[in-house]
Amino acid sequence: MIATKDIRIEKDFLGEKEVPSVAYYGVQTLRAVENFPITGYRIHPSLITAMAIVKKAAALANMDTGYLAKDIGHEIAEAAQEIVDGKFHDQFIVDPIQGGAGTSINMNTNEVIANRALERMGYEKGEYAKISPNTHVNMAQSTNDAFPTGIHIATLMMLEELLITMEELHAAFRAKAKEFDHVIKMGRTHLQDAVPIRLGQEFEAYSRVLERDIKRIKQSRQHLYEVNMGATAVGTGLNANPMYIEQVVKHLRTFSGFPLVGAEHLVDATQNTDAYTEVSAALKVCMMNMSKIANDLRIMASGPRVGLAEIQLPARQPGSSIMPGKVNPVMAEVINQVAFQVIGNDHTICLASEAGQLELNVMEPVLVFNLIQSISIMNNGFRVFREYCIKGITANEELLKQYVEKSVGIITAVNPHIGYEAASRIAREAIETGKSVRELCLEHGVLTEEELDIILDPFEMTHPEIAGASLLKNKKM
């Protein structure tokens, strides 16, 4: 290695390259930066951390087998731990979308750890004869097992955070369901008046579907716990000592905090990426459900003067550059857009997973880029949706009550008491005259005021049973 004050010269089998003297990355990282200026993004911090965990576990496992000198292995492990602790993340400069099945990410990791380990031992960066990114940091590994294992750990880390946020959002929906349990409103099917429902019942439904999504995402993690570490290049484990394979998984379990196990069949685990598509599918279903909820809230909050105006969403910002006083349902709208992105990401993940060939899927970089993005924007979206929207929703109770009283749909509750034909005539007259169902029932003498009070009671109309069933005990149709 040749070095000056500002640069050092590193070389690989393709030739020499100038590397900034202060940089912890090396020649292979710089080649990747030149080759793949694709997204303008950097590697996600969770993946950087996960890759460092992989390298620390590998170093200790290689020391366990006796193949890696303890002084070198110790410094590699310590350098990796520094990255886990959040240091040197600015040295991970390769684009997340890249050719090579993740080799650039793997080598960026190897080079940063090697150079930091060299520095810790008192050597200059780039003195790879002492500690090599390949010989030492990447010992008994291939990108094809180190990178997928890092993806598994990063995804599990991010899902853990997402699930906490989802539980908090679920609690917010449950709280609103309880708060609004007494609020009667008109239910709608086909966007037309149907029969009454309580606003709390609608929010309870939102909490229930989110509860299923939480369970679905938890279940989707099952195959992420299986890692192919020790598979090396094609799953056969060439250059990986059996003791190393056992020990590296043990160390991964300890450092990650997840119940990781070695994959039962390493060739299968190296070829196939269905573990990621399973997670992505669960995320997609969740966002389909959340987007539907966001749509509902936008409809119910439409107005404020000539829309439904059933609920009020918290005002977060002025809504127009030309219309003074306009406020838009921006927090619901952003959830819709998160859904569109996650659904699109899922399609990309499916295509990337399908594109595997023979012993390896080389499309894992774009796959993990989209998977991590989906989890990240869901976590961020749910957090602000709960804090800035759901928690502050209020109901326009008096207006909702008026809607119910004016609705023709409540004739459905009267139907069992006067018969379908009579109910149809009253419904038609209500539509034509604008009179309420209550008024017309009294005008035609089909029911008394007291009977209507029982039948049209909000709780009578929003529970499984004939509204006013007690009135039918001695009455034959």
Task: Name these PLM-found stretches.
Residues 1-477:
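Conserved, well-structured ligand/cofactor-binding cores
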